[in-house]
Every structure is written in structure tokens, then in C-alpha cells.
Amino acid sequence: AIEGGNGVKVNKIHKADSPNYLFIDVNILKDAAPGTYYFVFSKDGKPEFKYPYEIAARESGSVQRKSYTAADMIYLIMPDRFANGDPSNDSTSDTAEKSDRSKYFGRHGGDIQGIIDHLDYIEDLGATAIWCTPLLEDNEPDGSYHGYACSDYYHIDPRFGSNELYREMVAKAHEKGLKVVMDIVTNHCG
């Protein structure tokens, strides 16, 4: 069941081979009100726990947002290997893998600030869009630099920066007329 309003409907529930996983197909209705909805998980007809599901308010003008065309030149960036604009975030106490430039598959320290610092360079190349490999948290003990084993779909990996710094990067890219692709991999995670 869902609590919090009539804006979200459960279409189907899929049980996985493992009892640790459950997949839920939902339909977010066109008139769904922004807010927090709750999936209510029950056992033997009695509620066991609730899981929050937030629907944010649509940003003004988001429907008119320009898309990408064949005329765009997209510059692909692997942030960890691009530029280190803030060495203080190369290793954090909250993440498993620490920066080690001597390891080929280790983290090398590139970050969002490094991208911001080089937006003029990207613009001068003639790029019209930036596509960063995933910047969301990838808290694997090894090989986490590429970001393709996301462990938190809501937060930028602290070794890259913060959600606020990501928004700043996008705003500064837009000021230069650069579009930004946010790469997110949802079919496998860490």
C-alpha cells in the first residue's frame, strides 16, 4: 500500500529469487502532488515498516528545456581522471577507497571543482555539452573511480564534491551555453 496521497499507484510487485529483494513498478500520475509518499510493507496483513518515496516539485520551465541534437559535440569526462580542483576531498573518512595515484584502477583525485576550473577549456574545444561518467557515490573498496557501481543514488560522491557543487557546475556550464548530461546507471549498483 501507499500512504501520502493519490499521486502514486503500484502497478506490479516482483519478487526476486533472493528474499532480500523486491521490485515495485509504480505509476506517478500527472497530477501527483509534490511531497513524501510511503510504501507500506506488510506481513500477514499487518504493517511491518514504511519506506519514504519523495516526489519533488517540477522546476518552472523544465518542460521547455532544450535537448541534445546531432549538431551537439559532447565532451565525455571521467571526472576522477580529468582535473583535481580540490585535493582536500581526494580521500574521505566516509568512503572505503582512498586516493592512490600509483594504482592504475585506483582513485586519482579528479573532481567537480576540477571540471568547473576547466569549463573555458571545454568551451574553447568547441564542445556544446559535457557528459560526465557517474558522479553519484560509489563506495566500493576498489576501482570506484569510474562511478559505475553506485551505492547512493541521492548524493554526489564526496570525493567529487557535493550536490551543491554539482548544481554550481551545471549552472556555470549553462552560463557558457554548455549542456550537461548526468550519467546514472540504475541496472547495477554497489
Feature map (PLM): residue ranges:
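Immunoglobulin-like IPT/TIG beta-sandwich domains and homologous Ig-like subdomains
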Residues: 1-45
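A short, small-residue-rich loop immediately preceding and capping a beta-strand
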Residues: 185
